[in-house]
Amino acid sequence: MHKLIIKYNKQLKMLNLRDGKTYTISEDERADITLKSLGEVIHLEQNNQGTWQANHTSINKVLVRKGDLDDITLQLYTEADYASFAYPSIQDTMTIGPNAYDDMVIQSLMNAIIIKDFQSIQESQYVRIVHDKNTDVYINYELQEQLTNKAYIGDHIYVEGIWLEVQADGLNVLSQNTVASSLIRLTQEMPHAQADDYNTYHRSPRIIHREPTDDIKIERPPQPIQKNNTVIWRSIIPPLVMIALTVVIFLVRPIGIYILMMIGMSSVTIVFGITTYFSEKKKYNKDVEKREKDYKDYLDNKSKEINKAIKAQRFSLNYHYPTVAEIKDIVETKAPRIYEKTSHHHDFLHYKLGIANVEKSFKLDYQEEEFNQRRDELFDDAKELYEFYTDVEQAPLINDLNHGPIAYIGARHLILEELEKMLIQLSIFHSYHDLEFLFVTREDEVETLKWARWLPHMTLRGQNIRGFVYNQRTRDQILTSIYSMIKERIQAVRERSKSNEQIIFTPQLVFVITDMSLIIDHVILEYVNQDLSEYGISLIFVEDVIESLPEHVDTIIDIKSRTEGELITKEKELVQLKFTPENIDNVDKEYIARRLANLIHVEHLKNAIPDSITFLEMYNVKEVDQLDVVNRWRQNETYKTMAVPLGVRGKDDILSLNLHEKAHGPHGLVAGTTGSGKSEIIQSYILSLAINFHPHEVAFLLIDYKGGGMANLFKDLVHLVGTITNLDGDEAMRALTSIKAELRKRQRLFGEHDVNHINQYHKLFKEGIATEPMPHLFIISDEFAELKSEQPDFMKELVSTARIGRSLGIHLILATQKPSGVVDDQIWSNSKFKLALKVQDRQDSNEILKTPDAADITLPGRAYLQVGNNEIYELFQSAWSGATYDIEGDKLEVEDKTIYMINDYGQLQAINKDLSGLEDEETKENQTELEAVIDHIESITTRLEIEEVKRPWLPPLPENVYQEDLVETDFRKLWSDDAKEVELTLGLKDVPEEQYQGPMVLQLKKAGHIALIGSPGYGRTTFLHNIIFDVARHHRPDQAHMYLFDFGTNGLMPVTDIPHVADYFTVDQEDKIAKAIRIFNDEIDRRKKILSQYRVTSISEYRKLTGETIPHVFILIDNFDAVKDSPFQEVFENMMIKMTREGLALDMQVTLTASRANAMKTPMYINMKTRIAMFLYDKSEVSNVVGQQKFAVKDVVGRALLSSDDNVSFHIGQPFKHDETKSYNDQINDEVSAMTEFYKGETPSDIPMMPDEIKYEDYRESLSLPDIVANGALPIGLDYEGVTLQKIKLTEPAMISSENPREIAHIAEIMMKEIDILNEKYAICIADSSGEFKAYRHQVANFAEEREDIKAIHQLMIEDLKQREMDGPFEKDSLYIINDFKTFIDCTYIPEDDVKKLITKGPELGLNILFVGIHKELIDAYDKQIDVARKMINQFSIGIRISDQQFFKFRFIQREPVIKENEAYMVANQAYQKIRWFK
């Protein structure tokens, strides 16, 4: 190992260099070493000889580089540069310098430094460093300004190339120069940095010292020796009596030798009797002695055997339940006994209470005689031996947490100490994978247990929180989750109860409750009052007295004092066993916990399946270039094998998945619950196939029902030929149609090349015989359970299609989170391979694998591969393609330098950073390996110019389609003199049956009139905009005229300025619409006459024949529904029926929109040849529009369905693309302006309409009104029909009538506007009895208002007429204005003949007469003069409704509007027209 010191611009850093690693030094915070203002990036790495280099320059002890602000000094230290010296033992000051008298001599130093106060370092934990002002001293890599500084144990000191480390017993030194010293050297080895796996811990095989269990039997003593109770005199007396009788007989009757014989025999009998007696007595005594000796030897041996067994038991107990002091040694030495107990061991959850006389582990058998009259001391000896070994004295007393709740009673501080001992014991011997603790305790007791926070067992990993509940917040945060966990475990047991299968829950939870008040009102109380042992939960209660304990407690422990405790009951049985608790006063509990906290328990060996492996690691490369994709594409052939790496079984043991039909394929299932890595394994497989096979050999069609997440990842992959996301019913059918179309296409190509299998076709394609690429198509559904639930018919058809498509190269991979109830027999039988990751329960595992194994998987990415009927069944770790892609040395590794504080709950809390990341100068997202590989493949595809495969699945129609993407939209290029047939590009159509998407084009001749039916807000107006601009861009304004009827919400108003638009109508413009109807009817008649005249059938034929330009007429109606109930409904509908019936041949076309089909009358609707349905709230209405359809119209703005044989679906185009710099209306205005500027020809005329107000002065110049007056006419206003000038010819008699004098006065004003011109031409005489012309009395030749004056006017008229009759016309004509004709007659009594003469002859002779009067007065008068004048005059202005006047008999006008101010009717030649007088 090497250490590198980097110095630059008063910045000092140290780096521990590890062989094989690379490091970066720069000013970037993400670098391994950050130096401010460095100005360059330095890469550190080893060359092939192991020499460390900085940017390819070797570092030989010291390397100096030029920096922006200062030299960069790199000092490399090796083990040879290391030394360690003890502090001087006598003095309290030492020096380090270049001088011979220094305690530590280093020649390279310029000045000495002084180390002081090291004798008291054990108490103070620091020494003092003294140096002069010329010496730079760094402590912990910070330059010190003071001359005296403290350096604590573990601190690093740097002085002029010398590195020092302060230790409690001395100094560690790194120096490239020789260090000479008389101080004691402590070690010569440089302390190595801990290996990456230093803290990893693996269980060793456990050594179990079993307690003796063999029975020891103490046999009863043998039966006592039976003593011969015969007395000696019984053997002697009979012979003696015989001798005595013989002597008596001899004395009475001597019998010779016979007596001798009798006496001899008797004597012998006596001798033998005496000897026999003493012989038997001696034997008896010997037998008794032997019996006693043998049995006592037996008891002695038994005693030894029992004692040995007791010692073995005591040893076993002491070994497996050591003292806490011994436990400290176990942890300190990282002994293999740590975590030795598992849930499968007999002593799982066993711990020591203290020292007591415990029951023997073996049975001592002895049967005492029930009754014996004689006392046998040997029986007493055996009984004494039996009773002596009743217990094992001073042995550990063991308790366990497996058999119901336990409780501690006594003083709380004593109980807490016992719980601490239990914590230590269980934590040392049980892994935190198997055991966790949860303490519910009082807040004031948390400090006592604070040391336990270091124990990994105190972290509840399922909740990511420390297992301490001591207040309301922690209660709510933890207990609710624990409640849910208990509930789940109870449910799991109930589900397994039918199978009689035992469940072992992991981890076991030890639930310690020292304060019931925290859970008394929590829902978890219902479970706390039960025995939860069956569910992997051990309950421990703490109370002061036994009366406070819950009734379901099985084991009770009474802690009486620190030296006395009692096990009262055990498993509900009374025990009353006293014990002595262990004293742990001198044990550092936190030290044990901290040492244990450093260990990372790895349950599986590293040379087995790795926990994770990245995609590139699986391929054993670091950079995507090393994948050698091009060669793989060139060498791999799908017809031989399709095996690609998917994961690893172990180190360097690749597992491949081969979906060749004769291997693992072609179809399969993937199952895995949320977080199992299901999507990731599919991603890795897709990526692996893409790396190994050319896009012409392998392609993917992704069905991602969850929403397109996976589809987005592969959108740039050339192998991806389609994605299906978020399917509704119609999209499902569309997808199925596309897939079936692909099958038909493949079958057609197979038939063309006389092959019947994809492998044969691929071989022909490789040989160049077949030219169209046809890759294996992998249809992959990421969540088919939901798809099957929502679209069962689609799923059924998909599986069936895949089955049919086996030989066509179709592969189906179905993935699901929960296979239970989803994988039916059809899916199972068609799936040869199964990949099972972590599933929710055993039922799911059985469903996919027919074994429960997958339910036991815990790691993401871990999976079982099953092929066929267990032909292959392997566990492996799948590759993870989501890892960050980084090329060593190419860019800086991003390091999270956030500082976290571990809070009271054991959770990480950032304390130095704004978590938003917005404060960073640059927020950059790292590229994943998947993205890097896809980018690499994309670059290869571009470089090799690989032709894309025809896509079997085209994406769903976009939600925005633009006209410019479908057809040329530059009108400058499209306008021409040649009249073209009209083609309308409506949008983008989708034809899945033909695997085609393209412009939706209608030829107007064939399409006829168009009706679009759709709900409001779904793009009806946009549809019309699209047509308007499509027509306008392809035809000049003189070739296409448009009439826009906007009966909606003024949606057509923005396009009214297009030069092609003749006029624009709204629903409230009744007069204008009525006028348009008349114009359309006239135009129809005019065009029909043309056809008849030239004997052609259509206007297009007329154009070809004559070359004349007759424009196409487009009538576009938005929201035809508004026609109903409108005042003009009948006439408008009649006109539309006529237009739709006759207009097509006349090049007059109708396009309309409506919200329902019955908005039109049946005859009109029948004439609408092209019908289009958009989204309709009433689904049945779609059928009314387009008939029976395969696909419904999606609830998408702009989506439509065209009535045709196949009912083509399309999306309506928009005239302009969205531009953030311009609004839609601005874009319209820009194009309209461009058209207007570009086009210089004639534009269509609008419908002439009467302005709301017409002032004489406004029209005086434009209409040359003075000239008209000079030519003998009075301009009075405009007519409503043509909005043309209306005038009264003064050369003809005229009559003007109105309803009231006020309007007569206004008429007088208009008539006299050009009085000066009139005076020049006429001699004006006015008879004004009512005074309306009074203002002009001084401006005319004669003016009369009085009766006599009026008579004079009458005489003047007659004389003037006579004179003209005699002399002929005068140079100056006369103009007589008779205002109030009725009064004039009454005053003058003018005869009828005079009236006739004035009307008939006056104009010929230059005498012009104008009658003015109130209409009612003229009608009500019975004067014949008025009737004569009315009948003879042909010029009238009548200021009342035609229906109300009585001058003429006209046809009654229904709903004739009231005459407004300044309005009137001009009547001439028995015809009338409505006019408005000038103001």
Swiss-Prot record:
Membrane topology of this protein: Multi-pass membrane protein
Main location: membrane
Location relative to the cell: Cell membrane
Any one GO molecular-function label of the UniProt entry: DNA binding
Residues exposed to the Extracellular side: 253-256
Recorded superkingdom: Bacteria
Key words of the record: ATP-binding, Cell membrane, Membrane, Nucleotide-binding, Repeat, Transmembrane, Transmembrane helix, Virulence
Membrane-side (Cytoplasmic) residue stretches: 1-229, 280-1479
Binding residues for ATP: 672-679, 1014-1021
Transmembrane segments annotated in the record for this chain: 230-252, 257-279
InterPro entries: Firmicutes_EssC_C (IPR023839), Firmicutes_EssC_N (IPR022206), FtsK/SpoIIIE/SftA (IPR050206), FtsK_dom (IPR002543), P-loop_NTPase (IPR027417), SMAD_FHA_dom_sf (IPR008984)
Limits of the FtsK domain: 652-846, 997-1183
Entries under SUPFAM superfamilies matching the protein: P-loop containing nucleoside triphosphate hydrolases, SMAD/FHA domain
One GO term describing the cellular component: plasma membrane
Function: Component of the type VII secretion system (Ess). Required for the secretion of substrates including EsxA and EsxB. However, unable to support secretion of the substrate protein EsxC.
Similarity field: Belongs to the EssC family.
Subunit structure: Homooligomer. Interacts with EsaE.
Protein name in the entry: Type VII secretion system protein EssC
Gene name, Swiss-Prot/TrEMBL: essC
